[in-house]
Amino acid sequence: MTDLPDTDFTQRFIFDENDARGELVSLERSYAEVLAKHPYPEPVAQLLGELMAAASLLVGTMKFDGLLILQARSEGPVPMLMIECSSEREIRGLARYEADQIAPDATLSDLMANGVLAITVDPTEGQRYQGIVDLDGETLSDCFTNYFVMSQQVGTKFWLNADGKRARGLLLQQLPADRIKDDDERTDSWRKLTALAGTLTAEELLGLDNETILHRLYHEEAVRLFEEQSLRFNCSCSRERSANALVSLGLEDAQNLVVEHGGNIEIDCQFCNERYLFDAADVAQLFAGAGIDSPSDTRH
């Protein structure tokens, strides 16, 4: 059996004569998995894809074991977007939306009025870190670029696009002074690299392979492209986690829920639509300390 070609990956590159690095991301299968879980309107599907691309690029800039969480909230018809991407490069996402309030040509400001974006790093060991930025740019690309302008000294720019089938992203980031020591020359070099990237159209970013994109933008620069690093969709929900949520309620409340819901408590994962059912016997077993070894009923 022939392996399917990898459609979900990031790929780093570096400029040999400039103090800058970059990364490209392409998502197809994982993007399709996320969109298959809910009937997202096209503008929402595009935002989700762009946020998935951003999360994938951000994980590549961080050295940590744990989880990166991007959560956008607003007062608009898309009150919430959320993407989780682990250091193992597993990604999932979801959105909440009011379909009847979303026009086909809706912009970011239309969809997420008065929005804020929280970027959370939740390491396996150590303290959680969170940064917040207003969603006041014309695009998500602008918002992520603004976040780095406000929160870090290093220059960083994003270009993000998605069309419901493919999500792509490009990141450029300045490196510490090494090849170019003069401040003015460094500034000019960075401006040139970002200006060239700014000529890339959405159609080109979505439709061209990485080698072609880099040649199109930087054929006069010395660029080294590294190996691809795969990503995949994976949901971390489980029956055990759902059971732990029930235990946190306490025995009496859990038993009452069983009665109120006709003999079964149903816990749905909002990310993947997996459903976990617990009956009175399951609840009794949980609080007896035996855990849940086999589901009484689990279904998609």
UniProtKB/Swiss-Prot annotation:
Pfam family, one: HSP33
Domain of life: Bacteria
Subcellular location: Cytoplasm
The protein's role, per its UniProt record: Redox regulated molecular chaperone. Protects both thermally unfolding and oxidatively damaged proteins from irreversible aggregation. Plays an important role in the bacterial defense system toward oxidative stress.
Cited HAMAP family: HslO
PANTHER family in the record: 33 KDA CHAPERONIN
Family assignment from sequence similarity: Belongs to the HSP33 family.
Record's protein name: 33 kDa chaperonin
The organism's taxonomic lineage, starting at the top: Bacteria, Pseudomonadati, Pseudomonadota, Gammaproteobacteria, Pseudomonadales
